[in-house]
Design a protein with these regions (language model features):
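N-terminal, positively charged nucleic-acid-binding surface of large information/translation enzymes
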Residues: 1-174
Length: 174
């Protein structure tokens, strides 16, 4: 099968090695939530990114692509509650641990699906928003922005969901 051949021949690394030293093309991956199997929209999104990265490799660019996963947030909490976890009957720490375990299991599932779809990326070094290194980089970036005077305090509405007992992201409040 083609996938096994690509893995055996380390196809992705061979492409990178071939273009080492050439101008880089970096596509930053806006990550999907790790809250279940890939759905059609996420599969299409990742396939388009794969097409863009590969086409730039064919043009001679060095094209490292690090897939990412968002492992925080309400979609993951909702997914494990649908599996029967009652967040009110366990501690916050236990609920968060269950969310983290679930998210990591979904990353593995989604990663394997992407590989079966023929996508290539550095699956050995994905970025995952729950990784301490990732969280640390976010804090350092925020600190640098604050030192440059880019952070300010102001007023804006916070849309609260009494059903979910959490604030919703702006894009969720349409």
């Amino acid at each position: 099968n083609i996938l096994r051949k690509w893995e055996k021949n380390n196809h992705y690394q061979a492409i990178l090695k071939h273009h080492k030293g050439q101008p880089s093309f970096i596509l930053h991956d806006g990550p999907p939530y790790a809250n279940g199997n890939l759905h059609a929209g996420t599969a299409m999104n990742r396939s388009i990114k794969d097409f863009i990265v590969r086409s730039h490799a064919m043009l001679g660019y060095y094209t490292p692509f690090f897939p990412g996963w968002d492992t925080h947030g309400l979609p993951i909490e909702n997914a494990i509650q649908k599996l029967g976890v009652d967040r009110k009957s366990i501690s916050v720490a236990e609920f968060r641990r269950k969310c983290e375990e679930f998210a990591h299991s979904q990353i593995t599932t989604q990663m394997e699906t992407e590989k079966r779809l023929g996508q290539i990326a550095d699956y050995e070094h994905p970025y995952i928003s729950l990784q301490k290194e990732f969280e640390g980089r976010q804090i350092r970036t925020f600190a640098n922005m604050a030192l440059k005077g880019m952070i300010f305090q102001g007023l804006k509405p916070v849309y609260w969901s009494p059903f979910n007992e959490t604030a919703g992201a702006g894009s969720e409040n349409i």
